[in-house]
């Protein structure tokens, strides 16, 4: 197996570990899905690029309504609470029209009631979209330069030990599993977006990338563009492929999409 293919298979393995569980995954839709995608800057690049990647994969009927706001303003609960904003009205209009097959949102920062925003939107969406699926994109931990120190503060060696705990013990246990129990007829699954940045950062540190990529710097040639960890293009491409596999079930090992990088994502 070549180094390029080995690198690409990392994300196939990640999806097997971190995305939906058996019988809780996406349904296969040969021609594409009609989507409403809402979030912030750790969600937006993947949602926008998904239109390109889905078209390349042959999903001719793929379409999406995209609504974004920065930071916590892009959380599900924030959109819901800001009920008269132009962005929230756009979301409601898209759901009111019916026929939406996937409603994807970013992870919410409401720690006191972590399912509140998601439940509000699911309740709103269901009457006109009874067959809707719900996808929750789980971003990486921000400020990557501090990853290991933050992990060690919680008793873990590094981000690779901490992040699975965040996914399983926080997001799946406290949010996704709760929503699944409350809405047993709705297909609800996670999209492990954050693994793209975490894995590529480690590959860059270990000199396993087949491109000249810095850890921090310009978007076309770096993993991250700033200290907070906003995505360079290689992370956007890898993360979008994770979205494609999570939403459409595509086998990334045989996907022919040209990411523009020598490294097989």
Could you describe each region identified by the protein language model?
Residues 89-233:
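Alpha-helical cap/lid subdomain in secreted, periplasmic
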Residues 34, 38, 42-124:
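Conserved SGNH/GDSL esterase-like catalytic core that processes O-acyl groups on lipids
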């Amino acid at each position: 197996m070549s180094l390029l293919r080995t690198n690409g298979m990392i994300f196939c393995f990640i999806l097997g570990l971190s995305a939906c569980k058996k019988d809780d995954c996406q349904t296969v839709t040969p021609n594409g899905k009609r989507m409403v995608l809402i979030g912030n800057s750790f969600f937006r690049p993947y949602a926008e690029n998904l239109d390109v990647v889905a078209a390349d994969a042959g999903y001719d009927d793929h379409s999406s309504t995209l609504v974004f706001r920065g930071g916590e303003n892009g959380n599900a609960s924030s959109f819901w609470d800001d009920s008269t904003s132009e962005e929230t009205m756009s979301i409601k209009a898209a759901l009111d029209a019916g026929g939406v097959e996937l409603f994807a949102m970013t992870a919410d920062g409401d720690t006191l009631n972590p399912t509140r925003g998601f439940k509000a939107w699911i309740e709103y969406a269901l009457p006109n979209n009874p067959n809707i699926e719900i996808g929750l994109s789980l971003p990486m931990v921000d400020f990557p330069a501090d990853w290991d120190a933050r992990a060690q503060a919680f008793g873990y060696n590094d981000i690779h030990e901490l992040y699975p705990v965040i996914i399983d013990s926080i997001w799946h246990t406290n949010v996704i599993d709760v929503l699944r129990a409350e809405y047993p007829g709705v297909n609800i699954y996670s999209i492990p977006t954050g693994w793209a940045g975490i894995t590529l950062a480690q590959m860059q540190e270990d000199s396993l990338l087949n491109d000249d990529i810095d850890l921090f710097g310009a978007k076309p040639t770096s993993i991250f563009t700033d200290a907070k960890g906003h995505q360079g293009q290689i992370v956007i491409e890898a993360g979008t492929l994770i979205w494609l596999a999570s939403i459409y079930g595509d086998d990334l090992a045989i996907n022919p999409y040209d990411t523009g990088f020598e490294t097989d994502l």
